[in-house]
Amino acid sequence: MVIKKYIDDAVSLLRQIVAIPSCSFEEDEVAGFLCGYLEDAGLEVMRIGNNITSRLDFDASLPTLMLCAHIDTVKAADSYTFDPYNPPEAEDRILGLGSNDDGGSVVSMIATFLYFRDLKSAPVNLYLLLSCEEERSGKGGTTGLRETIAANADFAIVGEPTGMEANIAEKGLLVIDATAYGRSAHAARAEEGDNAIYTAIRDIETLRSFKFEKVSPLLGEVKLSVTGINAGTVHNVIPETCTFMVDIRPNECYTNEEIFNMLQACVKSTLKPRNLSNRSSATPAGHPLIRTAEALHIPTPTSATTSDWMRLPVPAIKMGPGDSHRSHKADEYILKSEISEGIEKYIEFISNISK
């Protein structure tokens, strides 16, 4: 069966969905468009909120592989040199917000799904999940679909821009909002107050120098970064509160609860986790997903970024077209050749998964 048609259709589809704004929690329009596209292609589709699912059952005795990619994007960076929703056309690439993260995986997985539908055969049953709210860990995305996923899939490929390498582990995500407290006073009488900014600075330095002793052979050290700070509204008042954000990328050696408790014990600021469930992930050793990647000589590195994988109740790998270094940056793009490679390698991987 000629694959070129599926590649051409995927490139065309990606241009169309890039033009539809779909920031996290604002995916209604793109979800409706993709539902219509899949239904027009002859698939039975179920929409759960702004998540889209479809099944291909070839043999009840076969396990089911889920193809999962997210349809939402981050907000466009201010430094775009073109309209992120109406980008210029280029001969070798598709430009625009979400083209690389995660539109390339979305359209490549759709093309792969349709390829096996038309082939009417595969060594596994297939389940397609196009998820929402991934970029902001929303409860309406895969977080709220654990039972649905567990009932429909035995294992999964999570589509993210990995250059079609099969990531077999990824760090988790723990975001903490911190508040340092002090006592307000006139700036001319600073000694009468207690500047919350200074407390925050001391705590930030404590966090910055904090050492996590356990190092994972797969995922390395826990990474911690302070990524935002805010205090004060006028020049002549000592601020009584100062807030800051902490981004932590855990390995599997610690639970998020353990990390949170360790950090709270060493700072004066009050810490509040946004979500404790975004755990690290690793494909079980010897799993068919790993064996298939190795048989096809696909590299199996680990990943520094997070994805829907951390919310899945089934074993998975992370693999998709594009380059993670382009994600969340201005002038985002994906190469047409990467879309082609993505579809071809997905088809090859699935065709060989039982071998």
Regions found by a protein language model. Give the residues of each.
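Acidic/His- and Gly-rich active-site-bordering loop/insert found
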Residues: 2-97, 119
